[in-house]
Amino acid sequence: MAAIKAINSKAEVARAQAALAVNICAARGLQDVLRTNLGPKGTMKMLVSGAGDVKLTKDGNVLLHEMQIQHPTASLIAKVATAQDDITGDGTTSNVLIIGELLKQADLYISEGLHPRIIAEGFEIAKIKALEVLEQVKIKKEMKREIHLDVARTSLQTKVHPQLADVLTEAVVDSVLAIRRPNYPIDLFMVEIMEMKHKSETDTKLIKGLVLDHGARHPDMKKRVDDAFILTCNVSLEYEKTEVSSGFFYKTAEEKEKLVKAERKFIEDRVQKIIDLKDKVCAQSNKGFVVINQKGIDPFSLDALAKHGILALRRAKRRNMERLSLACGGVAVNSVEDLSVDCLGHAGLVYEYTLGEEKYTFIEDCINPRSVTLLVKGPNKHTLTQIKDAVRDGLRAIKNAIEDGCVVPGAGAVEVVIAEALVTYKHTIQGRARLGVQAFADALLIIPKVLAQNSGYDLQETLVKVQAEHSNSKQPVGIDLNTGEPMVAADAGVWDNYCVKKQLLHSCTVIATNILLVDEIMRAGMSSLKG
């Protein structure tokens, strides 16, 4: 009897073989759910929430976040896979598949009496060798636009259909190249992803500027301003109550009138300073003037600004204030005391767009914008959500490629190369640990196998062809998913991120090893004592 039973008679316990069987069963169950998602030919999953919301996706990260996984081991694997997505933006499905396959291959040897610790040692040796091979396979490239397009397309085609992937690829690459600055880290928060429920998903486009999800609040203000100066400010243009509890006392109606006028004058002076700046910079030209304020603007102030031909937007979101300065230039001001031309940004075109009851303000034609907007369009909510998830992964794929300074061949080529190298390397290892290396090599081949299977080809036949071609050509060979034939991934422009593969090898080995070495599962928390 398990020792825990003596302490707590209601505890549940699984030991030795039973514990391993439970864990391997959970890993393979999760693998079976996700295996049909892998690659550009993967199938969709429909997630229906408790409230009846429908989500169509084949993004492993979304699935693992949304699914309610109750099994503790499956939940652990899901957390590792979603952490991979948070760090590198890709490789979620591959992570689950490889962990499941490592445990499956290990199970074959354990059932023949091999101790899990020996397999774990073999896995560790294989991982170190696999990382060495990955270093040799990676291709250092000058990061030109064509390489970025190939990397983004490879990532996006696994998330959305090919026609949409082609549209998104151009937009995603141009947005990262626009915000990229030499010798600075790339900040993807400077790419605003704005959704608009309108037209079809292929109308998604890149705006070299900013889109705000609100419009002007005064009927007389211009709907379109060409060649505009932009003043971004965080100044209250309405009367605000004091922060401390205070009051004004008056004896007569005249005194009250004076107080009201003093309050009004306080705001009018601020507005007048903005109007004076507009008159100063636009006096000799037809240039427009736009004020974007983070705080409120009262109706009187709006009226005064409208009379002088100024387009004013109030209550802009805080995150957009930083983006405005980067997109249009200029400086966001917190006071109207020292306004000058240097504070102003510039945009070639500012216009308001009305869609149903929603209003949007487009700020376009900025010179060298360091912040841009991806305007995602789609007919319904779940299409928009799917595109946004894909765009985020595409952005991170390009960022990874730029930061790594290298790429690795995709389409299952890397896994085939590493597996071949491990089979050769196995003969140099003494003792039974070589079986762990063999198991690791066989497990990695799950990626090309599933890619072939999801594309409707015979997985064994396709894999044999690819391995034969690799042996003959000595180049990384992947699978052409349109024909099922081997192809040189580099020539076809199918590239994966180096950091994704590196992270994949590390995390899969660690988790698979940890799960293998579990020999007892106990459920003995306080909740199981009730009743």
Swiss-Prot record:
InterPro entries, per database record: Chap_CCT_zeta, Chaperone_TCP-1, Chaperonin_TCP-1_CS, Cpn60/GroEL/TCP-1, GroEL-like_apical_dom_sf, GROEL-like_equatorial_sf, TCP-1-like_intermed_sf, TCP-1_chaperonin
Name the Gene Ontology biological process terms. protein folding
Spell out the molecular function terms from Gene Ontology.
ATP binding; ATP hydrolysis activity; ATP-dependent protein folding chaperone; unfolded protein binding
UniProt keyword list:
ATP-binding, Chaperone, Cytoplasm, Nucleotide-binding
Its signal peptide is: none
Q: Which GO terms describe its cellular component?
A: chaperonin-containing T-complex
> Where does the record place it?
Cytoplasm
Which family does this protein fall into? Belongs to the TCP-1 chaperonin family.
Q: Which PANTHER family does the record cross-reference, listed alphabetically?
A: CHAPERONIN
Please describe what this protein does. Component of the chaperonin-containing T-complex (TRiC), a molecular chaperone complex that assists the folding of proteins upon ATP hydrolysis.
The entry describes its oligomerization and partners as:
Component of the chaperonin-containing T-complex (TRiC), a heterooligomeric complex of about 850 to 900 kDa that forms two stacked rings, 12 to 16 nm in diameter.
Name-wise, this protein is: T-complex protein 1 subunit zeta-2
Species for this entry? Bos taurus
